[in-house]
């Protein structure tokens, strides 16, 4: 009760201070809906803020302002506004706004995702850029990804005629791909009931939910020290559970490297240990590599499978391309340059269903001007990648799934075309983008080449529900269940 009383007093004090002083000095903010006293626009937002932001952009334009408690939030919903934030003013707007739930000791300051652009951040990104995600490393590991896809097909062949929650199969496959890239071994046994894959996924998704759940301290920063609803504590517990999954493997490797004659495996763990990274840095880095490399990619592939299920003509066209180029052998990553329709299908999936609907929020290091509006120092900035991908001013028939729009098009998602930014852009662009592209394309191609599938209980594709579950990543709700069968 004492904590609640102190917190209530903090809300009242911070609100009074804002009413007295908070609105002065920034008379040229972007327009936006009128805020209510104290809470601002908080109560005007629902369960799908990305969709609401896109609607607000139709009224207020490329960039608009929301008051979230005492915090000022600027939202960009067009490619031109995104370009200003992610390119023109990339350095000034490169700081990270960290959700209170994620401010766990030892994590934020060692995080590629959440820390500011410090020397530690630069060193960690350098390790990723020069060791893990180089073209040479990606190509050298292609056979591992292809082998795991073959194992996935073998598993699904054993499930013919049964309902399969496809995202769990995808997730387990991706975890083992990353496990081999990082530890040179599988993490879980695909399909085994006690393999731990589901537990790992639940930890990750719960953390993503907590990051986007309502936390009064995000809107009234004076409450930050109290952790009123235990969200920071729960994130810390999730991290502890995740670290335990690979902790034994990490400790075993440390001991092995101390033995004379140790033969380096040349995997990412060896690189981390040889680079002198401490346990906090290694755990934070592995957490984000597994999290970003599995959860976001799994969601994207599930969305691709959903769209292909709803659009059998597109599936047939993709399958025909694979048959023409690849023939009877298994598709390989080296085939990708000759598979333009596969590339277009991946792009179209990322346009309609970006893995992170709202790019992780940035924070202004200095006051600057965007599109003739003032963006104050410490303002929170959000870029609505979901809304930009569906902007009718940019895309013809934007709600229709049509890979053809990307055939003979130079538009790409590598951070140079601001109409398609599922992985962000600028210095905060996802460092794992090159390998994520390989994951997504390979698994989609493997499904289409090797499997036929239908919906359970004779359900028509016309009745397939395509709803979104909003979080830091965008999941399909309800999950996609299919009944696999081998292709004749």
Swiss-Prot record:
Look up the record and name the pathway of this protein. Answer: Alkaloid biosynthesis; (S)-reticuline biosynthesis; (S)-reticuline from (S)-norcoclaurine: step 3/4
The record ties this protein, via PANTHER family, to: CYTOCHROME P450, CYTOCHROME P450, FAMILY 76, SUBFAMILY C, POLYPEPTIDE 5-RELATED
Q: Answer yes or no on keyword Oxidoreductase.
A: yes
Q: Which residues bind heme?
A: 430
Q: Which gene encodes it?
A: CYP80B2
Return the protein name: (S)-N-methylcoclaurine 3'-hydroxylase isozyme 2
Give the bilayer topology: Single-pass membrane protein
The protein's role, per its UniProt record: 3'-hydroxylation of (S)-N-methylcoclaurine.
Species lineage: Eukaryota, Viridiplantae, Streptophyta, Embryophyta, Tracheophyta
Q: Which UniProt keywords apply?
A: Endoplasmic reticulum, Heme, Iron, Membrane, Metal-binding, Microsome, Monooxygenase, Oxidoreductase, Transmembrane, Transmembrane helix
**Which source organism does the UniProt entry give?**
Eschscholzia californica
Q: Which biological processes are named by the entry's GO terms?
A: isoquinoline alkaloid biosynthetic process
Write out the GO MF terms.
Answer: heme binding; iron ion binding; N-methylcoclaurine 3'-monooxygenase activity
Q: Which family does it belong to?
A: Belongs to the cytochrome P450 family.
Q: Which SUPFAM superfamilies match?
A: Cytochrome P450
| Major enzyme class | oxidoreductase
